[in-house]
């Protein structure tokens, strides 16, 4: 009955396996380090167009930057003197994988811990400076972070210096348990002693500043500045919505929202922070 077989609707083509992979060899590869995708506007940006400040040319989004990059943008060239580098992070709870995570963070960032501390000059104004780096385990606050910031305030009291801190953190470091949480009280006590000495303390909130850092020294500055659109809060958005059973505003926990509600004194563009810091330090007695 082959004479009455229905004809196929489509022509059968046998694939040529020898052609497999030949196309991919002709497609040019673009190195990942050449471009960055803006988290806000989703545009692909040639990294050189971001500039030293790493600001999106399309929507002005502030990319997260390292402590070293922040240092370059802020202080007078060659003026930074790093302090407290000998303090080593321990693993008191023998938390699984913690030592490996610490080692990887050190290799990736070039830092000893999540905060860079020292003395520096900003437009000839001498300050005690701390810069938190979210690339180091999300700048979570462990015992060493708390100790370095506490010692910075104590040094500032001895040398009659204003303190400037760039905050960025995911909160307390869970791998260190209650010892991490105790840093909130320890640093806050140091802030109070510095304030009692009549010295100026300036905080700059950067993206993200959350958890125990927000609940302690980040919000204790005499003046609190923030970079545009920085995420600032204590608990996460979903946790709050689940707890209160309400939908939160779209801009909730953004720096602009906090300014509107009196928690932030001013939103300052990254490119203008250096001038603003120098002006505020000089206005409040200066650090000479």
Curated annotation (Swiss-Prot):
Enzyme Commission no: 2.1.3.15
Named cofactor requirement(s): Zn(2+)
Zinc finger (C4-type): 38-59
Highest taxon, organism lineage: Bacteria
Gene Ontology CC terms: acetyl-CoA carboxylase complex
Molecular-function annotations in GO: acetyl-CoA carboxylase activity; ATP binding; carboxyl- or carbamoyltransferase activity; zinc ion binding
Pfam families: Carboxyl_trans (PF01039)
Localization in the cell: Cytoplasm
Domain CoA carboxyltransferase N-terminal: 34-288
Reactions accelerated catalytically: N(6)-carboxybiotinyl-L-lysyl-[protein] + acetyl-CoA = N(6)-biotinyl-L-lysyl-[protein] + malonyl-CoA
An example Gene Ontology biological process: malonyl-CoA biosynthetic process
The protein's role, per its UniProt record: Component of the acetyl coenzyme A carboxylase (ACC) complex. Biotin carboxylase (BC) catalyzes the carboxylation of biotin on its carrier protein (BCCP) and then the CO(2) group is transferred by the transcarboxylase to acetyl-CoA to form malonyl-CoA.
Subunit structure: Acetyl-CoA carboxylase is a heterohexamer composed of biotin carboxyl carrier protein (AccB), biotin carboxylase (AccC) and two subunits each of ACCase subunit alpha (AccA) and ACCase subunit beta (AccD).
Family to which this protein belongs: Belongs to the AccD/PCCB family.
Protein name, entry field: Acetyl-coenzyme A carboxylase carboxyl transferase subunit beta
Species annotation: Streptococcus pyogenes serotype M1
Gene from which the chain derives: accD
């Amino acid at each position: 009955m082959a004479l009455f077989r229905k004809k196929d609707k489509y022509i059968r083509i046998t694939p040529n396996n020898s052609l497999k992979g030949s196309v991919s060899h002709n497609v040019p590869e673009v190195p990942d380090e050449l471009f960055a995708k803006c988290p806000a506007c989703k545009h692909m940006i040639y990294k050189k167009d971001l500039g030293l400040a790493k600001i999106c040319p399309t929507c002005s989004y502030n990319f997260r930057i390292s402590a070293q990059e922040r240092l370059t943008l802020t202080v007078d060239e060659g003026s930074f003197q790093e302090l407290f580098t000998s303090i080593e992070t321990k693993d008191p709870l023998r938390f699984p994988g913690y030592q490996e995570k610490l080692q990887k963070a050190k290799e990736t960032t070039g830092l000893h811990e999540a905060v860079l501390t020292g003395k520096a000059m900003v437009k000839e104004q001498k300050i005690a400076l701390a810069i938190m780096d979210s690339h180091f385990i999300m700048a979570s606050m462990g015992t060493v972070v708390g100790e370095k910031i506490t010692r910075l305030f104590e040094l500032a009291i001895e040398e009659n210096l204003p303190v400037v801190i760039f905050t960025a953190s995911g909160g307390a470091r869970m791998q260190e348990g209650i010892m991490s949480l105790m840093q909130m009280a320890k640093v806050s006590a140091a802030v109070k002693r510095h304030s009692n000495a009549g010295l100026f303390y300036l905080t700059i909130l950067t993206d993200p500043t959350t958890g125990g850092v927000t609940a302690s020294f980040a919000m204790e500055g005499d003046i609190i500045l923030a970079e545009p659109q920085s995420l600032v809060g204590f608990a996460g958005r979903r946790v709050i919505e689940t707890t209160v059973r309400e939908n939160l505003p779209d801009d909730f926990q953004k720096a602009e929202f906090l300014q509107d509600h009196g928690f932030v004194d001013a939103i300052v563009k990254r490119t203008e922070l250096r001038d603003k810091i120098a002006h505020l330090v000089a206005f409040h007695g200066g650090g000479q």
